[in-house]
Swiss-Prot record:
Regulatory subunit of the voltage-gated potassium (Kv) Shaker channels composed of pore-forming and potassium-conducting alpha subunits and of regulatory beta subunits. The beta-1/KCNAB1 cytoplasmic subunit mediates closure of delayed rectifier potassium channels by physically obstructing the pore via its N-terminal domain and increases the speed of channel closure for other family members. Promotes the inactivation of KCNA1, KCNA2, KCNA4, KCNA5 and KCNA6 alpha subunit-containing channels. It is found in: Cytoplasm; Membrane; Cell membrane. Keywords: Cell membrane, Cytoplasm, Ion transport, Membrane, NADP, Oxidoreductase, Potassium, Potassium transport, Transport. Its EC number is 1.1.1.-. It is a peripheral membrane protein. Homotetramer. Interaction with tetrameric potassium channel alpha subunits gives rise to a heterooctamer. Identified in potassium channel complexes containing KCNA1, KCNA2, KCNA4, KCNA5, KCNA6, KCNAB1 and KCNAB2. Part of a complex containing KCNA1, KCNA4 and LGI1; interaction with LGI1 inhibits down-regulation of KCNA1 channel activity. Interacts with the dimer formed by GNB1 and GNG2; this enhances KCNA1 binding. Interacts with SQSTM. This is Voltage-gated potassium channel subunit beta-1. The N-terminal domain of the beta subunit mediates closure of delayed rectifier potassium channels by physically obstructing the pore.
Amino acid sequence: MQVSIACTEHNLKSRNGEDRLLSKQSSNAPNVVNAARAKFRTVAIIARSLGTFTPQHHISLKESTAKQTGMKYRNLGKSGLRVSCLGLGTWVTFGGQISDEVAERLMTIAYESGVNLFDTAEVYAAGKAEVILGSIIKKKGWRRSSLVITTKLYWGGKAETERGLSRKHIIEGLKGSLQRLQLEYVDVVFANRPDSNTPMEEIVRAMTHVINQGMAMYWGTSRWSAMEIMEAYSVARQFNMIPPVCEQAEYHLFQREKVEVQLPELYHKIGVGAMTWSPLACGIISGKYGNGVPESSRASLKCYQWLKERIVSEEGRKQQNKLKDLSPIAERLGCTLPQLAVAWCLRNEGVSSVLLGSSTPEQLIENLGAIQVLPKMTSHVVNEIDNILRNKPYSKKDYRS
């Protein structure tokens, strides 16, 4: 969109210049006038062609592969930010389920495997996840410019003014996150959920402010509806502010519609990309719950009673049966079921990055292996998976065709 606007301005300037030139030379030689017209027509044609060429060129740069690690990198939406197609999330694990030593080991494995994206939030472990993440980055001495650090704002504290997406909390909340992370800025700050109590203009203005102040490079949304994202974009364009570049959404074999139907439309219309989380559905797809809920699993924790109920429900049993049917496909491809599930998420080109949540180095190494499975995700394999799942969502375009 920026290119097309620039081209339009260029055309207007060219047209004004053409008028001035023609008025000066109209009484002289007609051949000079014709030459000038031809020149400006050529400039206009080139400018218009750039407007159509640039998006195609952008798409051609969408994915690249690191030679040493094999990690793939994609643009975050239609922004210029390059993110590893696999990122490391810190929900539940950092500051909670795992020790600080294990957290450091996980980050080291991820970084050495080519992962540059690390995601956290002010609410994770009441801010402790940010503290651990920042301490590890400082200890390791990794170049800040080689990292993409993202955090999310909404639930900051118990006071009314310490949560939500008011201008006050966005600015104060991000300052608090930066202090815990020991960083000068984050690459992307996310609104962790919509806030019906705050006007959209106030949210967009606050996000624009923290970016202009150098506290963040970009901003995005998490668990927002397509309509809410479009409203934020419209407000940003109306008042010459900065629109969101990405939506964080849940995406896995059993949760598909938003990422496969709604977000692609937003990507093509306004450039908003998808960063997805929970590729293993909170561990449901890992295979560990095939025979009940193990004592050491996430579903066994008191605060995850909802997950346990989901697993033992009738729908949960149906999902486990489908996973058993998918196992032969994984065996044929020479991978594990979790690797198949992560590679299935990555095969969606509309997904900029998939956030992994691992509690052990072994789990992380296994999930990172999905990169090697990705080339095997042919249309035939994807159709096989769809035939087993029987939950493929269809867009309006699909129905029309």
